[in-house]
Amino acid sequence: MTDLHIVEASIAELRRALEAGTVTSVELVGACLRRIAHYDRHGIALNAVPLLNPKMFEEAGASDWRRRNGAALGPLDGIPYTAKDSYKVSGMTVAAGSPAFEHLIANEDAFTIGRLRAGGAVLI
């Protein structure tokens, strides 16, 4: 991977790096997970990302395949993002931090999540 600092990089910078082939979406997802692990799971243990998308690497790999084949879905294709756990993501819990809702599973995506997914963005 390049010397790109993903935490400080803008979406435009990440997109340019993806388009240039200096980084892949899979690598960006891995870098995000390392950053999350550093602050969320160890050290000061923020627990800011309580739920991870189990399909993130599959989605990132699909984005990389589309990019290699000239079929990117748009400027957000391959860009990792997070969403508050109160947003509905099909197949994932919508607990909003409440133990009372920890088993509530979304059966559809919220509008914003659906738009991001349609554009190829990768939910962490």
Task: Describe the predicted segments one by one.
Residues T24-V26, A45, A72, I79, ...:
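Loop/turn elements at helix/coil->beta-strand transitions in domains of secreted/extracellular proteins
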Residues R16, A31, W65, G114-A118:
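Residue-level signal for well-ordered alpha-helical scaffold segments within enzymatic catalytic domains
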Residues C32, M56, G78, K84, ...:
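Conserved hydrophobic/aromatic pocket- or pore-lining residues that grip, position, or stack substrates
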Residues I11, H38-G43, A62, R67, ...:
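Enzymes and membrane/adaptor proteins characterized by extended Gly/Ser/Thr/Asp/Glu-rich
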Residues M1-E59, N69:
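An N-terminal boundary/leader segment
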